[in-house]
Swiss-Prot record:
Family named by the database record: Belongs to the class I-like SAM-binding methyltransferase superfamily. Cation-independent O-methyltransferase family. COMT subfamily.
InterPro entries attached to this UniProt entry: COMT-like, O_MeTrfase_dom, Plant_O-MeTrfase_dimerisation, SAM-dependent_MTases_sf, WH-like_DNA-bd_sf, WH_DNA-bd_sf
PANTHER family, per the entry: O-METHYLTRANSFERASE CICE, PUTATIVE (AFU_ORTHOLOGUE AFUA_4G14580)-RELATED
UniProt-listed Enzyme Commission number(s): 2.1.1.-
Biological function: O-methyltransferase; part of the gene cluster that mediates the biosynthesis of DIF-1 (Differentiation Inducing Factor-1), a signal molecule involved in the differentiation of pstO (prestalk-O) cells. The three-step process begins with the formation of (2,4,6-trihydroxyphenyl)-1-hexan-1-one (THPH) by the polyketide synthase StlB. THPH is then dichlorinated by the flavin-dependent halogenase ChlA. The last step of DIF-1 biosynthesis is the O-methylation of dichloro-THPH (or des-methyl-DIF-1) by the methyltransferase DmtA to yield DIF-1.
Protein source organism: Dictyostelium discoideum (Social amoeba)
Pfam families documented for this protein: Dimerisation, Methyltransf_2
Protein name: Des-methyl DIF-1 methyltransferase A
GO molecular function: 3,5-dichloro-THPH methyl transferase activity; O-methyltransferase activity; protein dimerization activity; S-adenosylmethionine-dependent methyltransferase activity
Catalyses which reaction(s): (3,5-dichloro-2,4,6-trihydroxyphenyl)hexan-1-one + S-adenosyl-L-methionine = 1-(3,5-dichloro-2,6-dihydroxy-4-methoxyphenyl)hexan-1-one + S-adenosyl-L-homocysteine + H(+)
Protein's gene: dmtA
Induction: By cyclic-AMP; this induction is inhibited by DIF-1.
Amino acid sequence: MISNSDCDENLIKQQQQEIQDKNFLIDVAIGYTKSNALSCALKYKIPQLLEDKSKSCKELSEILKVNCDNLYRLLRTLSTIGIFIEDEVEDGVFRNSRLSNLLRNSNSDSWVNNVYLQSHPNVIQSFMYLDKTIECGTSQGMTSQGFSSAWELFEKDKSLNAHFHNTMTSFTSDEIKTILEYIDFNQYKSIVDLGGSSGELLKSIAKSSRGQLVESFINFDLPLVINQNKVNNENGAAEFDKRYSEVASDLFVDSDYPSADCYTLKFIFHMFNDDKVLTILDKISKSIKPNGKVYVFDHIVQPKNQPYAPFYFDLQMIVNFNGKERSQNEWKTIFEKSPFKIDTILILPDSKRMSVIELSLKQ
């Protein structure tokens, strides 16, 4: 028999759970305030201004030439989620927290670039058009803001473009050790990285013992990217391995890709719909040397009803790129329609985000 006290206890638990659920949903609904507040703090470079010291809002507002009271309210709000710390004794005086201290570093190989990228105003605003994207079936995040594509936005906003490509570089830096544990690139004479950004993947392979026998490394990307790489080199980057070169072009122009016996594509296919992925694969099939291989480094979405970052990337892909994150079955469906067959699917055990699909031409 269930006692009255048991019933009361269960009722209290249900009520507490309901309160937690309501608070959670409210927190999700107002999530844009957090991302916009963070975006604003990054715009004004507050983490860098604070450095290792405490500064008053009055001092910060004079440096930034902004309203002191509103700046205080911004930093006070961010301090409630651990970004910045307000002095317990003196009102309006802030210092960097453990979290905001991380945001001081925006070097090209730093993961922090992804924070800057995700909190950029145009990226945040693009999600205002998620409903339109769902309704019409094509990306509306950029076109609704007056850009023909995300690439046009990157071309116009050099800072955002740098954060985007630096984010790609940081992803490679995080994963290259695991990649080299599973793939020996010495079996290939030439490697082309399609959409290779700063060339971090090829440079890392060339430096490793698993790339010493490779004769040619070609980094293929858009002129905007390759031109920026040249500027970076002119600004002090040491001349790299003579086996390394770069080609400025577009994945979808009529010209062929550079010929090679190995092609790599790292987080490229998820930015395109199935038809464009098939177009790229068809072009590779016309340029790849006999017995060549293609390595696709990308997400393979797996769990259902669980917190999983690639599902959020998936929404970004449909809003901004007309792309998608794919399940293993979706990848198989694409490759069945292509000139390539799957040789191996490897879910890297030490990777937070990446799997490897190894392809070769169908006989």
